[in-house]
Amino acid sequence: MKFIRYFHKILTLILFVLILTQCSEKNSREYVKEGLEHLNNEQYDSARKSFLKAIEKDTNNAEGYYGLGGIYNYEKNFEEAERAFKAVLKIDPTHHNAWYSLGFTYELMGKKDEAEESYKKYRRLKGEIDSLINQEKH
């Protein structure tokens, strides 16, 4: 009987510790928010790490990839920036800012045709969004 009580106490303690560690662990969106805060403070290495953690937590977090793409552009790592922005668009093809950023990346890489194609998609999506916003106002 003592063994069962002891076992029950140990099991309760283990479950309590597991619950506490899960509660204190950040989720993907929180890592993106942290990354943006690092960006605002010009802490680019810390921002990159936060965006990578966001993606590690949720491989479908478009904003994590988007932030990472911005960091890679800042670091002039254009191939990685291109991959990051393409990952955003694979998750959300209507992410107009990712189309713009991909176009900008292509421009920096000297790929003018690809840049223009991305900008064209950005303008189309941005126009649709602006139209919806105008409809909401009226």
Can you say where each PLM-predicted feature lies in the sequence?
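C-terminal motif of bacterial Sec signal peptides marking the signal peptidase cleavage site
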Residues: 20-22
